[in-house]
Amino acid sequence: MQSLWSGYGRIQKVDLRFQESDRSQSAIVKFVDAAGAGEAHPRGWNGGASHTRKIRSYEVERNFYASFSSQCGDQCRVAKLLGADLHSPASESDWLMVLEDLDQPSHRGDGFPVRKSGVSEQELLACLSWLANFHAAFVSIDAPAVDDVLWPVGTYWHLATRWDEWDVMEPGKLKDAASIIDQRLNDCKFQTLVHGDAKLANFCFPASPGLVAAVDFQYVGRGCGMKDVAYLISSCLSDAECKRQQESLLNSYFNLLEAAVNARQDIEIDFSALESEWRELYRFAWADFYRFLAGWSPGHWKMHGYSDEITTRVLRELER
């Protein structure tokens, strides 16, 4: 089907045949070849820190599917883990996961065979609904349950894993404030699991409008849900669309999140306090990603006027 980023393996669709019957089932095999990696990164980021981060990311994904994915219901659908090398730590070698093929219908309903390069308002709301239900499923998760097996701080652009990119940033207020912005997000009282790479390309859509599924959990870890929301919006909307739709999209997300949190019987959350904190952190999450882009790919199309305005506002707040 496709190669993994920078030559770290491949993803293939296979047919599983069962010995006890004539039944077969399609599945997705994600094969990681750490020793064979080494394709040139399109922007030159191929150093030791990058390699270590990628190796860890595949181990994290394996751990997520093995130990956390079962907590994701139909409202935040993920693939079922069918098999994997789960008992030895990821190392400089080969390993694989066998996952449910989300394209195919199952006993849980229709499949998700469609991928999008652009979305309607309804489709974007479906992605926000997935995020809201995912965040609700793991809200207030304890650090000890996460930190040794997933990322202690989720997202692929987390500052502690991106010092190489920070180092090449142009000197200025954003570079100086990077650690403060990062710490503001890390100090969030209401923590959940964030997907960590919640771009449009990682959502799978049904043939007819409805719920969506998500893939690619290499950077899942603890954090503020606004990291996922800001990143999703940045992957879908233009400068003008971000400005025009920000408030309505945030309102929709928080309505969906409140309903999902209230549906849980095992926790008590002061949702008003959560919403107040996370709304305040939305712009910090956006500025944090902008910081990453400023080092990784200066001039990236996502560094538009809306991003500039939000980041400037954050920097001004920090100067007070």
Predicted features along the sequence, with ranges:
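A short glycine-rich, hydrophobically flanked beta-strand micro-motif that places a catalytic Asp/Glu
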Residues: 79-84, 203, 269-277
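Conserved ATP-binding subdomain of kinase catalytic cores across diverse folds
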Residues: 7-12, 17, 21-153, 225
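Regulatory N- and C-terminal appendages and interdomain linkers associated
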Residues: 1-5, 17-26, 93, 268, ...
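Active-site acidic catalytic loop and adjacent metal/ATP-binding pocket
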Residues: 10-18, 28, 180-227
